[in-house]
Amino acid sequence: MKIGFIGLGIMGKPMAKNLLKAGYTDLLVNNRSQAPVQELEAAGATGATQQEIGEQCDVVITMLPNSPQVKEVMLGENGVASHMKPGAVFIDCSSINPVASKEIYAELQKKGVEMLDAPVSGGEPKAIDG
């Protein structure tokens, strides 16, 4: 299974590292700034564009700060959703508003992509601990 992870900030970077530690080594990562991507590449992940993640991954995970960013990444021009294949799964770990989640879900359903709204909390220490 190939996993894509978008958003490598305070929570996302340790979450992605935990996927690698758990044996999910076919992990593609993306972030606006390149430093966390490079850190995860050194740990075994592969840096990728959002388009590559959409095209290649069976599961796409986002951990982004807010609703507008998740909508832009998924539904914006050349967004991840436009490249996802039927049967893929999108897991949003961001804390976004329900209206945005429903909008993203509706668009993904048109493509045969499933969505799991799975916001996380606990801050960096809990993300590191897994």
Region locations from a protein language model:
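Alpha-helical structural signal in soluble globular domains
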Residues: 39-43, 83, 103-107, 111
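Hydrophobic residues in well-ordered beta-strands that form the structural core
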Residues: 29, 49, 92, 115-117
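Rossmann-like NAD(P)-binding element
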Residues: 40, 48-100
